Regions:
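Residue-level signal for glycine
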Residues: 99-100
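Hydrophobic protein-protein interaction segments
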Residues: 38-40, 50-54, 127-128
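Sec-dependent bacterial lipoprotein signal peptides
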Residues: 1-19
Length: 131
């Protein structure tokens, strides 16, 4: 009979540990995303209106984080917020300035220079799908 309380204790410990290890998927955010500062704004996924709107297009939940991403790069001394969508083209139309306006990387040579010389700063949301 001594094994029953032991097994029950182990089972409860494992169940408790599995729930405590979850990230903040309930609101669709990457762990620690609330502590990130981007473009001078804390918690940019909620507080940068244009970025919040883009994130809402992804939906919520675990699949949203696996299929989409927001990555902060530095390019020529400026922040570039790259919104990576699993269902979108990986072309040069998803790179934003801090104010939400698109960078003009339509010239293939400029886009290749961006790809070659950008420096990854931080994954802001989800998964970096376009490396």
């Amino acid at each position: 009979m001594k094994t029953y309380p032991f097994l029950l204790s182990i089972s409860l410990l494992l169940v408790g540990a599995s729930f405590s290890c979850k990230n903040d998927e309930s609101n669709g955010l990457t762990p620690n995303s609330n502590s990130i500062e981007l473009c001078g704004v804390k918690n940019p996924l909620k507080n940068l209106t244009w970025l919040s709107t883009e994130i809402q297009k992804f939906g919520t939940g675990e699949s949203s984080q696996r299929l989409n991403g927001v990555v902060l790069y530095e390019y020529k001394g400026a922040n570039v917020v790259e919104v990576q969508c699993g269902l979108c083209s990986s072309t040069n139309i998803h790179q934003y300035k801090c104010d939400g306006t698109l960078y003009d990387f339509t010239d293939p040579n400029i886009f290749q220079d961006y790809i070659k010389n950008r420096k990854k700063i931080e994954l802001i949301f989800g998964t970096e799908i376009w490396k």
